[in-house]
Amino acid sequence: MSAKIIDGKRLSQEVRAECRARAARLAEKGTQPGLAVVIVGDNPASRVYVRNKAKACGETGIYSEVHEFPENANQDEVIGRIQELNGNPGIHGILVQLPLPRHFDSSRVTESVAVEKDVDGFHLYNVGALVTGSSIFPPCTPNGVMKMLEKYDIPIEGQHAVIVGRSNIVGKPMALMLLQKGATVTICTSRTRNLAEHTSRADILIVAAGKPRLITAMMVKPGATVIDVGINRLSDGKLAGDVDFESVKEKAGYITPVPGGVGPMTIAMLLCNTVVAAEQAHARLQGN
């Protein structure tokens, strides 16, 4: 048996087409969605992500601008810029590119983004809304995973979902979103004892541990859906996920590749959140 490949690249194009149509309708009414990205330092991966986001915005009809700061930037200076963007009516979404330099308090910086412009979903208000099932801006990567499961008609209710990784960006919000859809959820880490005992019981296995090829075929239930959120650069320069794709694809029912799986969906959901923020801003202007 060979798993069906969940094509994140193709699916992201469908999602982006929907966003493009909504952005065009807004533009006809006089509001072009706008996204500002704040980046601090010279992290090569972060710069690639920012370029990809800017390119995707241009292709979707979203205005974008990048605010760059050096590695030794003052935190208050960065927060001051974010506060300026909070008051800019032409900017509807603000994204702080993580990670920030070590001398920054990441929570304080992300908390400085206005709630209504928090398209990454990292503000405490939006985190709380996610807990209660009323989030307007769900975090982009978990939301992209949920969209994948939906589009491929993969059942969630009543299924056992195992998440490897407990980050605030992926693991924890992913668990909440699956719980809201009726899954039984187990959260593990790369240090969980007898990890394979947990992963091998999963109907849906989502891996976001940052450990290349952590999950092997022997750790996967036959026919399971395997979502690989990890992306790691190996010593030979090649990219690898947290799942040993070649072996696991022979055992899983569905699997995402790396690259071309979750990554494109993350950007697509960021675009959607930005359009939603612009739609809400336009409605406020109209007094609705």
Swiss-Prot record:
One of its GO terms (biological process) is tetrahydrofolate interconversion. InterPro entries: Aminoacid_DH-like_N_sf (IPR046346), NAD(P)-bd_dom_sf (IPR036291), THF_DH/CycHdrlase (IPR000672), THF_DH/CycHdrlase_cat_dom (IPR020630), THF_DH/CycHdrlase_CS (IPR020867), THF_DH/CycHdrlase_NAD-bd_dom (IPR020631). NADP(+) binds at residues 165-167, 190, 231. It catalyses: (6R)-5,10-methylene-5,6,7,8-tetrahydrofolate + NADP(+) = (6R)-5,10-methenyltetrahydrofolate + NADPH; (6R)-5,10-methenyltetrahydrofolate + H2O = (6R)-10-formyltetrahydrofolate + H(+). Pfam families: THF_DHG_CYH (PF00763), THF_DHG_CYH_C (PF02882). Its EC number is 1.5.1.5, 3.5.4.9. The keyword Oxidoreductase applies. GO terms for molecular function: methenyltetrahydrofolate cyclohydrolase activity; methylenetetrahydrofolate dehydrogenase (NADP+) activity. One of its GO terms (cellular component) is cytosol. Pathway: One-carbon metabolism; tetrahydrofolate interconversion. Keywords: Amino-acid biosynthesis, Histidine biosynthesis, Hydrolase, Methionine biosynthesis, Multifunctional enzyme, NADP, One-carbon metabolism, Oxidoreductase, Purine biosynthesis. The keyword Hydrolase applies. Homodimer. Belongs to the tetrahydrofolate dehydrogenase/cyclohydrolase family. Catalyzes the oxidation of 5,10-methylenetetrahydrofolate to 5,10-methenyltetrahydrofolate and then the hydrolysis of 5,10-methenyltetrahydrofolate to 10-formyltetrahydrofolate. This is Bifunctional protein FolD. The lineage of its organism: Bacteria, Pseudomonadati, Pseudomonadota, Betaproteobacteria, Nitrosomonadales. The gene is folD.
